[in-house]
Amino acid sequence: MSYILGTNLNSNKQVKIALTRIFGIGPKKAIQVCDQLGLSDTIKVNKLTKYQFDQILKIISQNYLVDSELKRVIQRDIKRLISIGCYRGFRHNAGLPLRGQRTHTNAKTCRKLRYVSIRS
């Protein structure tokens, strides 16, 4: 098992698939990182050298917001929406869908999550 940015990467998977385990790195960003390093699409994590790991870490940390930094930015944006009193802020506060989805019969998951977070 290999660790990059505090995330455990499965050593038997391809690099582009394993990188998607990092919060903030999706399939397209993982492919971009591999292309910047010139890595093959089929190379596995356990075949990478120490230098290649360092280069992956360098590229990700310089070019992308990932893991705790990204979570902090998302939380800050939500707090800003709540503080300015906009519609999306009210919906975040109430734990309801933000983007106009139907709530009469749907949106059970949002309300369940809200109930669990209030209860604990």
From Swiss-Prot:
Keywords: Mitochondrion, Ribonucleoprotein, Ribosomal protein, RNA-binding, rRNA-binding. GO terms for biological process: translation. Its main location: mitochondrion. It comes from the Eukaryota. GO terms for molecular function: rRNA binding; structural constituent of ribosome. The keyword NADP does not apply. It is found in: Mitochondrion. PROSITE patterns: RIBOSOMAL_S13_1, RIBOSOMAL_S13_2. InterPro entries: Rbsml_uS13_C, Ribosomal_uS13, Ribosomal_uS13-like_H2TH, Ribosomal_uS13_CS. One of its GO terms (cellular component) is mitochondrion. Belongs to the universal ribosomal protein uS13 family. Part of the small ribosomal subunit. Located at the top of the head of the small subunit, it contacts several helices of the 18S rRNA. This is Small ribosomal subunit protein uS13m. The lineage of its organism: Eukaryota, Viridiplantae, Streptophyta, Embryophyta, Marchantiophyta.
